[in-house]
């Protein structure tokens, strides 16, 4: 389907600059990606099943933190699909936890981990499972 959109010259100029920086070869693919992004955000709001990664940095010397993180993952095994643990240096570890479940539920799980004493920094990225997204 083709459709037209009216956009100010200033806005389209900024949009084209963004597309160039991101490596898009045409506006159509960028617009499709923007639409998909909005659809994914709507899925999350509606509580549909989502997947995500929680990436955290923590000090493994904090008493019982490693055990607490492992226990939390086992307690929520129905949502935790996998985890990857990396030793960054003598004190700090990076852990990537892959989760799946209703958007609000996995966000809540991430918030609980991020609030754990000893977790220095973290970020949750949630996206669609892809099943409901058109090409």
Feature names for model-found ranges:
Residues 5-7, 15, 25-36:
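Short amphipathic alpha-helical segments
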Residues 31, 40-47:
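Short, charge-rich, low-complexity interaction segments located
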Residues 48-60, 94-96:
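Short glycine-/aliphatic-rich beta-strand segments at the starts of folded cytosolic domains
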Residues 60-80:
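Short amphipathic alpha-helix segments
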Residues 61-62, 99-106:
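Helix N-cap motif at beta-to-alpha junctions
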Residues 67-72, 108-116:
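Short amphipathic alpha-helices in soluble, non-transmembrane regions
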Residues 78-86, 111, 115-130:
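Conserved short beta-strand edge segments in small beta-sheet-based binding/regulatory domains
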Residues 96-100, 132-135:
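Short, low-order "capping/linker" segments at domain edges
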């Amino acid at each position: 389907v083709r459709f037209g959109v009216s956009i100010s010259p200033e806005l389209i100029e900024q949009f084209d600059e963004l597309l160039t920086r991101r490596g898009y070869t045409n506006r159509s693919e960028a617009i499709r990606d923007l639409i998909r992004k909005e659809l994914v955000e709507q899925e999350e709001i509606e509580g549909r099943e989502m997947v995500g990664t929680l990436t955290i940095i923590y000090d493994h010397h904090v008493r019982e933190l490693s055990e607490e993180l492992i226990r939390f993952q086992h307690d929520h095994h129905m949502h935790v699909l996998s985890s990857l643990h990396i030793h960054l240096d003598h004190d700090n570890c990076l852990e990537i936890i892959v989760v799946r479940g209703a958007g609000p539920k996995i966000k809540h799980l991430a918030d609980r981990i991020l609030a754990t004493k000893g977790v220095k920094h973290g970020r949750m990225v949630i996206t669609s499972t892809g099943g409901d997204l058109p090409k």
